[in-house]
From Swiss-Prot:
Residues 105-109 are annotated as: G2. It comes from the Bacteria. Residues 71-239 form the tr-type G domain. This is Translation initiation factor IF-2. Residues 180-183 are annotated as: G4. Keywords: Cytoplasm, GTP-binding, Initiation factor, Nucleotide-binding, Protein biosynthesis. Belongs to the TRAFAC class translation factor GTPase superfamily. Classic translation factor GTPase family. IF-2 subfamily. One of its GO terms (molecular function) is translation initiation factor activity. One of the essential components for the initiation of protein synthesis. Protects formylmethionyl-tRNA from spontaneous hydrolysis and promotes its binding to the 30S ribosomal subunits. Also involved in the hydrolysis of GTP during the formation of the 70S ribosomal complex. GTP binds at residues 80-87, 126-130, 180-183. It is found in: Cytoplasm. It comes from Thermus thermophilus (strain ATCC 27634 / DSM 579 / HB8). Residues 80-87 are annotated as: G1.
Length: 571
């Protein structure tokens, strides 16, 4: 940009001229009047400062605006090992006999419902397993604020418990641990707490920050404490939403009903949806014909935190699809079609660039600016697993941290693939063969899945790739010094220093710095190095030479020219 007058810049920035003059005073920029001309660099500095100040003001204003919004209920997902009491807890919470209706007490479908207490409302999402929860997260939707991990007091932490924890953490949910079945004679809550501490979750009663609540979903003991803790955590996190914003929600589940047609279970996150609204969710679109809550009550509108069933989609939306309000049917159709085309193009692109080696995975990780290498480990025995973990724990570097999301005995599962896709992780299997369906799933999702028969083959591959990914470390190596003893000026006006090399050597291609009274006054490169008017590549200690520098013309007798180079430190 060219020079600009102060009053012109004020107009450009939408400021009063006096306001800009005051800003220039603060910046120490000299001027005579509002008609004075600013140098290009000063004008650009003003633009940047004003932009920064306005950005900060907007951020503060947005924070203040959010604080003035009404609170929304926390959204909670209940996860854990099969038969540890997830459905029984949900059943107790909503006071319906769902646990008896469902086969074997295992949840069959995703549901969402509200629990109203004197302290506030909590929205519970019921997933058939953490796979569905992770699938929702993969589609970019932050659904649950809090994950309650249910652990049976008699069984303790099981493989599915660890998977549930890993999936909840990958989804960015806050964790609460509910130790269930404390009414049983064989219950051992302290054992569960010890197991949690072994995994880095220290309960609050022992000085940590892990929230652990003992409960009995069967009798209801401790369930009120759990609800109070959920609401306390929600108050600390300060969940808020704007009921007047443009409506937005997320699909939890969809199904085709013989009588009603397509039914979508939706959680409203912002704004208020109303019957008659046109909506688009992923590649599906439609007009809301009816909304019902979890109890089957008809709703004309649904605001933030509401969980409702929606009728009116033309085709099945997917779990995790974001539901958006659109002005009319034509816009809904157009957006859905565009997304179909975008998906096809994206699938082709992803197919072409799926990581097939650890190096490719690391390269992708570096391009994203991540500093962690996420791994899922599977092994044939607990001993092998512990040995691999123990060795890998020492292989993290300052540049790349090895982060083991999940480590379990047994072959990789489809659940592992979903977690790996969500967290951009690699699955490394030792001494176990993944089933064909898992290999196929990994190929479809672009997840790196590798098997090993020798522990050190696995460790060496990770070690070499991490080392190859580290930022190179350099140290300075001084090559030599030359003392300026005479100064000559060429016909071109440029100075040349007549020097004596007093230490080491001065190479022609080295970087140099000029020292005066021990202080660095300039740093750059040599423009010319001569002996008796002949260009030379290098001058050794004890010899005289003439040195011209690229961009420096202020030599004084007694100055020292020091040559140096940066040398990479071996890994």
């Amino acid at each position: 940009m060219a020079k600009v007058r102060i009053y012109q810049l004020a107009k450009e920035l939408g400021m009063e001229t006096q306001e800009l003059l005051e800003l220039l005073d603060q910046m120490g920029v000299a001027y005579k009047s509002h008609a004075s001309t600013l140098e290009e660099k000063d004008a650009e500095a003003v633009r940047e400062l004003v932009k920064e100040q306005r950005g900060l003001q907007e951020k503060l204003a947005e924070e203040e605006r959010r604080k003035s919004l009404p609170r929304r209920p926390p959204v909670v997902v209940i996860m854990g090992h099969v038969d540890h009491g997830k459905t029984t807890l949900l059943d107790y919470l909503r006071k319906s006999r769902i646990a008896e209706k469902e086969a074997g007490g295992i949840t069959q479908h995703v549901g969402a419902f509200e629990v109203k207490t004197p302290q506030g409302t909590v929205v519970f999402i019921d997933t058939p397993g953490h796979e569905a929860f992770t699938t929702i997260r993969q589609r970019g939707a932050k659904v649950a604020d809090i994950a309650v991990i249910v652990i049976a007091a008699d069984d303790g932490i099981m493989p599915q418990t660890e998977e549930a924890i890993a999936h909840a953490k990958a989804a960015g949910a806050k964790l609460i641990f509910a130790i269930n079945k404390i009414d049983l004679p064989q219950a051992d809550p302290e054992k569960v707490k010890r197991q949690l501490m072994e995994r880095g979750f220290v309960p609050e009663e022992y000085g940590g920050d892990a929230i652990v609540i003992p409960i009995s979903a069967k009798t209801g003991q401790g369930v009120q404490d759990l609800l109070e803790m959920i609401l306390l955590l929600a108050e600390l996190e300060d969940y808020r939403a704007d009921p007047n914003a443009e409506p937005r929600g997320v699909i939890l589940e969809s199904k085709l009903d013989k009588q009603a047609g397509i039914i979508a279970n939706m959680l409203v996150q912002e704004g208020t949806f109303r019957v008659g609204d046109y909506v688009v969710a992923g590649e599906a679109y439609g007009r809301i014909r009816a909304m019902m809550d979890a109890d089957g009550n008809q709703r004309k509108e649904a605001g933030p935190g509401s969980a409702v069933q929606v009728l009116g989609f033309q085709e099945l939306p997917h779990a995790g699809d974001v539901v958006e309000w659109v002005p009319d049917l034509e816009a809904a159709k157009e957006i859905a079609e565009e997304r179909k085309e975008e998906r096809k193009a994206r699938e082709e692109e992803e197919k072409a660039r799926r990581p097939r080696t650890m190096a490719e995975l690391l390269r992708a990780m570096q391009e994203e600016g991540r500093k962690e290498l996420n791994l899922i480990l599977r092994a044939d025995t607990q001993g092998s697993l512990e040995a691999i973990q123990h060795i890998l724990a020492r292989e993290s570097t300052e540049d790349v941290k090895i982060n083991i999301l999940l480590a379990q005995v047994g072959a990789p599962t489809e659940s592992d693939v979903l977690l790996a896709q969500t967290a951009n992780a690699a699955i490394l299997a030792f001494g176990v063969n993944p089933p064909g369906s898992v290999k196929k799933k990994a190929e479809e999702k672009g997840v790196l899945l590798k098997t090993f028969r020798i522990i050190y083959d696995l460790v060496d591959e990770v070690r070499n790739m991490v080392k190859g990914q580290r930022e190179p470390q350099y140290k300075e190596e001084v090559l030599g010094q030359a003392e300026v003893r005479a100064i000559f000026r060429l016909p071109t006006g440029k100075q040349v220093a007549g020097c004596m090399v007093t230490q080491g050597r001065i190479p022609r291609n080295a970087e140099v710095r000029v020292l005066r009274d021990g202080q660095v006054i300039w740093q750059g490169r040599i423009a010319s190095l001569k002996r008796f008017k002949e260009d030379v590549r290098e001058v050794a200690q004890g010899y005289e030479c003439g040195i011209g520098l690229d961009g420096f013309d202020d030599f004084r007798e007694g100055d020292v020219i020091e040559a140096f180079q940066m040398v990479e430190v071996p890994a």
